[in-house]
Amino acid sequence: MSIHIVPKEQLSKDRINEKTADYIPPLLFANLRNLYQRRAERLQQLAKESSFVDYLNFSAQVAEAQQKALHDNPLKMEIADILEKSVIEGKPPLDCKTFQRTEHWQKLLHSLIAELLPDASEHVNAALDNLEKASEQELEQMADALLKNEFSQVSPEKALFIWAALSLYWAQMANQIPGKARAEYGEHRQFCPVCNSMPVSSVVQIGTTNGLRYLHCSLCESEWHVVRVKCSNCEQTRDLNYWSLDSEHAAVKAESCGDCGSYLKILYQEKDPKVEAVADDLASLILDAKMEEEGFARSSINPFLFPNE
């Protein structure tokens, strides 16, 4: 199954199966009012019991800066035409590899830099200073490379801040989509149906979506439904295994696939209601190391930790 976003009117005319549309929402948009603040608080909480205390607290500062930049730089745009075109082409409406960005994302970047500079360490200060002095063209080139998954083209210390701004931009746009989502047969379920980016992790939720697994987008912060006990990367079900560091009842596990050799973290809200897709993924880096030792490759990206090769 794949997920496509269509205008509300078209969804009504198509008379999509009510059980799929109503009881298993294919797509959930982020609540930007408290997303980044909640992430910052979770990072700070996890830092208290982590050997990565300094980096988790630093990441919390970035998340807090994102919350402020979001508040100070609202975005209003007409997205109905973009959605209609994406329906015709059968592509994600905000495809990160082809979408024509405006200067708004750079405005968000400079807002983040201004917020973070006063308390930045010497190493972070150097990265922020370099970004602040970079030309618009240089920033666009680095953004292009990151959105095309060409991570080796951008140093990790710069990539973090550029992605933080791009993520804010895409999240703002995603929240203005006036359509609904429908699930239908197709491919590429491993990528976000809104922006075509990779997930960061997946969350088995509680509440109105109790027991359902949603992949969380590393860019636009949207979440899309993928059934459990199926590889989110290749959709095979034959050779799945679940790994954890503590016990079989751990709130954070890794789902590995013997068919494609990949793995993705799964967070269980029923085990810990406070788990957060980005924060808990970042705080469980030891589990990533274990999965690499076992020969599995990560099928996701964390916005606070970019590969340098």
Curated annotation (Swiss-Prot):
It is found in: Cytoplasm. Gene3D superfamilies: FdhE-like domain (3.90.1670.10). InterPro entries: FdhE-like_sf, FdhE_C, FdhE_central, FdhE_N, Formate_DH_accessory. One of its GO terms (molecular function) is ferric iron binding. One of its GO terms (biological process) is protein maturation. Belongs to the FdhE family. PANTHER family: PROTEIN FDHE (PTHR37689:SF1). This is Protein FdhE homolog. It comes from Photorhabdus laumondii subsp. laumondii (strain DSM 15139 / CIP 105565 / TT01). The lineage of its organism: Bacteria, Pseudomonadati, Pseudomonadota, Gammaproteobacteria, Enterobacterales. The gene is fdhE.
